[in-house]
Amino acid sequence: MTNIRKTHPLMKILNDAFIDLPTPSNISSWWNFGSLLGLCLIMQILTGLFLAMHYTPDTSTAFSSVAHICRDVNYGWFIRYLHANGASMFFICLYAHIGRGLYYGSYMFQETWNIGVLLLLTVMATAFVGYVLPWGQMSFWGATVITNLLSAIPYIGTTLVEWIWGGFSVDKATLTRFFAFHFILPFIITALAAVHLLFLHETGSNNPTGIPSNMDMIPFHPYYTIKDILGALLLILTLLALTLFTPDLLGDPDNYTPANPLSTPAHIKPEWYFLFAYAILRSIPNKLGGVLALLLSILILIFIPMLQTSKQRSMMFRPFSQLLFWTLIADLLTLTWIGGQPVEHPYIIVGQLASILYFLLILVLMPTAGLIENKLLKW
């Protein structure tokens, strides 16, 4: 009798995806982040569900309902901070996962990569609308500033902004619809993640060398299930340490002040995981230009497979490209730092230079390095 996991229609799908999946024998810990993202998504949906049971999406009660969750609900403070810091862990894993894809040339699986970019945009949208829900000062002003960027679109901009707001300012209608979006988007993310996996399993995983590994595969279970469990334990340990010792480390103190349309905070800034894009937006002294640069800073990922000039897929054996890759990481960290600073000298010029370098590295320097390395192969 054949094992039920290989014959049952549902079990067969799970078996082919997580048990008998042929996997390269040499994939490193950088390949752990996919499963960690799945874990983050499950945790966010569960903690979010329990928060939604006590939260009220209404301008008059939203802030106090969050306070009620933290004070009166059993372990409500714990669920709330797990959810808030879980978002940070989600983005850490997301950026590591994308970085791995860039370094090892995983973007050559184009369908998988493009759905990944779509996933990134959806997660960013979810995090943005979620940040508005506690209805603190930074929630309100963040929503006002970011939605207002759409008014830079010629002709239809203003109408579009008012349509999204549901009125002439960020108000009750905006909060209600943002709650609806924040509830539905994670399920859309789950569906997209399933398609992401579907396309990945059409080709099989890439590996650190970037060389096809068809002749050297091992079953996913037990080798990588145990490795994923170790990664999951480390993720949970980090999340618990963050939540229980410094729950407000990554948050903004302004969000503990209820939203007030009559008082603007001194420095409006998004959560840390959006600061690099915010810095690029601010570095261009023109509204439409800034919005386009902001969009392009993320959408540039779609063009990366087209910018591949090297004959080698991975950067493992390409020292020049490695140097440029780590320069890009340093540049993104610089942009993240600048995004959190006030708009004054010297931060303005540093932000502008870092923004120029960001696009220069991806569009010019890295493809050029690939061509130079191709020449070196002939020596």
Swiss-Prot record:
Mind telling me which GO cellular component terms the entry cites? Answer: mitochondrial inner membrane; respiratory chain complex III
Instruction: Specify one Pfam family.
Output: Cytochrome_B
Q: What else is known?
A: Heme 1 (or BL or b562) is low-potential and absorbs at about 562 nm, and heme 2 (or BH or b566) is high-potential and absorbs at about 566 nm.
Q: Can you quote the record's cofactor note?
A: Binds 2 heme b groups non-covalently.
Name the GO terms of the biological process aspect: mitochondrial electron transport, ubiquinol to cytochrome c
Q: Does the keyword Oxidoreductase apply?
A: no
Question: Which gene is the coding source of this polypeptide chain?
Answer: MT-CYB
Annotated membrane-spanning segments are 33-53, 77-98, 113-133, 178-198, 226-246, 288-308, 320-340, 347-367
Q: What family is this?
A: Belongs to the cytochrome b family.
User: What does this protein do, in the record's words?
Assistant: Component of the ubiquinol-cytochrome c reductase complex (complex III or cytochrome b-c1 complex) that is part of the mitochondrial respiratory chain. The b-c1 complex mediates electron transfer from ubiquinol to cytochrome c. Contributes to the generation of a proton gradient across the mitochondrial membrane that is then used for ATP synthesis.
How is this protein organized at the quaternary level? The cytochrome bc1 complex contains 11 subunits: 3 respiratory subunits (MT-CYB, CYC1 and UQCRFS1), 2 core proteins (UQCRC1 and UQCRC2) and 6 low-molecular weight proteins (UQCRH/QCR6, UQCRB/QCR7, UQCRQ/QCR8, UQCR10/QCR9, UQCR11/QCR10 and a cleavage product of UQCRFS1). This cytochrome bc1 complex then forms a dimer.
Tell me the InterPro entries matching this sequence.
Cyt_b/b6_C (IPR005798), Cyt_b/b6_C_sf (IPR036150), Cyt_b/b6_N (IPR005797), Cytb/b6-like_sf (IPR027387), Cytochrome_b (IPR030689), Cytochrome_b_C_euk/bac (IPR048260), Cytochrome_b_N_euk/bac (IPR048259), Di-haem_cyt_TM (IPR016174)
What positions belong to coiled-coil segments? none
Q: Single GO molecular-function term? A: ubiquinol-cytochrome-c reductase activity
Which topology term describes how it sits in the membrane? Multi-pass membrane protein
Chain residues that bind heme b b562: 83, 182
Where it mainly occurs, coarsely classed, is: mitochondrion
Tell me yes or no: is Transport among this UniProt entry's keywords.
yes
* Protein name, as recorded: Cytochrome b
Q: Where in the cell is it found?
A: Mitochondrion inner membrane
Query: Which cofactors are reported in the record for this sequence?
Result: heme b
Residues reported in the UniProt entry to bind heme b b566: 97, 196
* The species this protein was found in: Delphinus delphis (Short-beaked common dolphin)
